Amino acid sequence: MKWLLWLGYIFSFGLLYLWIVKKSKQIAQQPNTKLVESTSIPFKVKDFVSACGGKENFVNIKTTPTQLIVTFKDVNSVSLTKLNALNIKGINKNQNQFRFVLGNFVNELKKKIEDEQ
């Protein structure tokens, strides 16, 4: 009679194990649609704007998930030494457009630049 009890334990825990494995595979197959964005900017926005030649020097600002793409009126007024002091990960220049590789806080930086007076 004891063997029947053990057989019941094995059967029920076996079914529970198979159900857990099935559910975990379903969860693992779901695509991650969330984009992680940070709201903390590791430098002062005013320092970034002044290093770029002031708010009036900005013509157009676009973002990718980790880059800020800025078109400037006067490229010569952009101070690369001041920008490098802000620990920007990368700066790419193409004619009057700069690509700043910053991180996942670029949308917050874009909002603060546009809101700045």
Curated annotation (Swiss-Prot):
Any one Gene Ontology BP term: phosphoenolpyruvate-dependent sugar phosphotransferase system
Entries under InterPro entries matching the protein: Glu_permease_IIB, PTS_IIB_1
Bilayer topology annotation: Single-pass membrane protein
Ranges that cross the membrane: 1-21
Ranges of residues in domain PTS EIIB type-1: 42-117
Keyword Repressor appears in the UniProt entry: no
Highest taxon of source: Bacteria
Keywords: Membrane, Phosphoprotein, Phosphotransferase system, Transferase, Transmembrane, Transmembrane helix
Principal location: membrane
Enzyme class, broadest EC rank: transferase
Molecular-function annotations in GO: protein-N(PI)-phosphohistidine-sugar phosphotransferase activity
GO cellular component: membrane
Domain free text: The EIIB domain is phosphorylated by phospho-EIIA on a cysteinyl or histidyl residue, depending on the transported sugar. Then, it transfers the phosphoryl group to the sugar substrate concomitantly with the sugar uptake processed by the EIIC domain.
Protein name listed in UniProt: Putative phosphotransferase enzyme IIB component MG129
Gene source species: Mycoplasma genitalium (strain ATCC 33530 / DSM 19775 / NCTC 10195 / G37)
Lineage: Bacteria, Bacillati, Mycoplasmatota, Mycoplasmoidales, Mycoplasmoidaceae
